[in-house]
């Protein structure tokens, strides 16, 4: 098409094109190697498309019809990979029409050029190094065309996977066609001394070989073991996990269950790699100081999962840690089913976590009724189970002699205090609860019974009681908390799952949660967690049934809680709360699926 001097001067355009191709495949290979399976990011298509434009120009300038034609086809397929993920993807028929139109336009252009332009041919062989090579015979040109055809078929293979298998990926047949076609093309261009194409097809063999090696690893990957990894990081998660394991062992006794769990899970023939208690930290500084140990345990966990390759991974609540684990497993090529039990509080803060759930999970188990609306338009499969505490509390048989066993006085009625399970919870929340009790009119008419979630911290409870001179007080072990809820006049409870338990036990409750200054600052001004209600019963019904005192020292004082105690001591206020608690129970149990149905969905359906 152009005089020889201009053709030689523009020859580096092909090298420039190959720079884009090489960068695209380097990015693809880097991500594939990191994740352990074939990955094709969007930047791959943009870089390849840019390279294709330069290569089409190179084909016209160097009078190489097959190069211009095949890279035009590839350019359209690159475009299709980006277009199909857009809001307005074109139909397949239009893409096919575009391919035919481009093929016609390029063929006609070369036909006209070869007829009327003296320097243009259908398949020139630029010898930029001026090697003493004889002109390629018809047989060699035929070999070159066969190689180019096979090499370009790879993107038609990719297009097939894209349209009919809905996979914007580079499958093993793509790399096989690349390797075979690229090898033939390399021989041809070595024969003709075409430096650009020698570099193009020679370097192109490396990503083909590397990706085929990964594909072969995938083919011989260790099959799934008949096991299930389950992880819970908090007491509430341990309760859920214990109930889940009980149902699992009854329905699937041969499945080996291992992971992270507390006492209730460990009591269900569960192999704990780590005790749940080793992951329990709260508050900014506690989490910061515990990060090295948490990171070490996280590393051991995901490596153990990849080594064991369980059929299913079930993460219970504890979202920040579990999201990190789930992302790592997927990035390292874990193909099993991943289930998250308990939806993170995306309705309260960090709604972007919904995208993470949709991207990495196969199934999300919901326990709160209002969460169903959050995913009604989502592709993520969800199952609403209802809150398991509802059934637990409904079937609970109280110990009628619990007060005698604990040698509790019976001369006065009592108020219950549930300060929380962590050391920091006890030091902050119990102090407020005790001070409020002491400042109220109930101090002279009632005993204060403090529920202890962790016997290790009983001495802290005693210290707080003694420091505030709360003489009419006693400690009640957590195993008697439901008896305590049912027989107390009303309760003071730290915001959390315990508040839902008091509601389901029809216990009138005042909610307290005193935060440290740093936690208050982060919640208000960094994470912007400002809600009309924070305790689950209030959120479920969409109205305030339990008074809430939540925040830092400037947000409320113990005198405010004491005033609420004086109001709640009236029988009318207590009955009003109990009626609302019955509404909570009804809302939780409407349209809930059974655990047996859920387990069938997890273990008897494909991912």
From Swiss-Prot:
<protein>
    <recommendedName>
        <fullName>Lipid-A-disaccharide synthase</fullName>
        <ecNumber>2.4.1.182</ecNumber>
    </recommendedName>
</protein>
<dbReference type="GO" id="GO:0016020">
    <property type="term" value="C:membrane"/>
</dbReference>
<dbReference type="Pfam" id="PF02684">
    <property type="entry name" value="LpxB"/>
</dbReference>
<dbReference type="GO" id="GO:0005543">
    <property type="term" value="F:phospholipid binding"/>
</dbReference>
<feature type="region of interest" description="Unknown">
    <location>
        <begin position="1"/>
        <end position="224"/>
    </location>
</feature>
<comment type="function">
    <text>Condensation of UDP-2,3-diacylglucosamine and 2,3-diacylglucosamine-1-phosphate to form lipid A disaccharide, a precursor of lipid A, a phosphorylated glycolipid that anchors the lipopolysaccharide to the outer membrane of the cell.</text>
</comment>
<dbReference type="InterPro" id="IPR011499">
    <property type="entry name" value="Lipid_A_biosynth_N"/>
</dbReference>
<keyword id="KW-0808">Transferase</keyword>
<dbReference type="Pfam" id="PF07578">
    <property type="entry name" value="LAB_N"/>
</dbReference>
<comment type="pathway">
    <text>Bacterial outer membrane biogenesis; LPS lipid A biosynthesis.</text>
</comment>
<comment type="similarity">
    <text>In the C-terminal section; belongs to the LpxB family.</text>
</comment>
<keyword id="KW-0441">Lipid A biosynthesis</keyword>
<keyword id="KW-0328">Glycosyltransferase</keyword>
<dbReference type="GO" id="GO:0009245">
    <property type="term" value="P:lipid A biosynthetic process"/>
</dbReference>
<feature type="region of interest" description="Lipid-A-disaccharide synthase">
    <location>
        <begin position="225"/>
        <end position="607"/>
    </location>
</feature>
<dbReference type="GO" id="GO:0008915">
    <property type="term" value="F:lipid-A-disaccharide synthase activity"/>
</dbReference>
<keyword id="KW-0444">Lipid biosynthesis</keyword>
<dbReference type="InterPro" id="IPR003835">
    <property type="entry name" value="Glyco_trans_19"/>
</dbReference>
<keyword id="KW-0443">Lipid metabolism</keyword>
